[in-house]
């Protein structure tokens, strides 16, 4: 089950990069919440931000992944370096991203996506502190 969540998360980064809002709209729960460096908001605003290109998640380099499954909830931590275009400017930031997935009707849906800015980028080749990667 952990591998299924890891694949879904990785696919999600690609869909965000591709601005594939149709697939993302289906993945994000109606009551999903998103936390960014600039604020927090719900599904509709996140989808519109991606669709309109206000934030273009250009490339997420995933360094470490940890997944914990609790009943019908999966909590995934990604340590990433994100290349994004914000307001026409390309920026690169190290983040710990928390993704919460909830199993509904036989499939996993995203309930929350939170970006925590890290003070320093991950060292190349570092091993995760535990979990699955």
Task: List each model region and its residues.
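A beta-strand edge to alpha-helix "cap/lid" segment located at domain peripheries
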Residues: 1-133
């Amino acid at each position: 089950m952990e591998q299924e969540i890891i694949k879904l998360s990785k696919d999600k980064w690609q869909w965000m990069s591709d601005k594939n809002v149709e697939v993302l709209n289906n993945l994000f729960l109606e009551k999903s919440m998103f936390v960014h460096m600039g604020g927090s908001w719900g599904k509709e605003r996140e989808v519109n931000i991606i669709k309109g290109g206000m934030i273009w998640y250009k490339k997420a380099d995933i360094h470490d992944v940890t997944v914990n499954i609790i009943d019908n909830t999966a909590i995934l931590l990604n340590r990433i370096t994100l290349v994004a275009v914000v307001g026409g400017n390309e920026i690169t930031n190290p983040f710990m991203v928390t993704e919460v997935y909830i199993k509904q009707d036989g499939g996993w849906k995203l309930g929350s996506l939170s970006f925590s800015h890290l003070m320093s980028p991950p060292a190349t080749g570092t091993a995760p502190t535990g979990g699955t990667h």
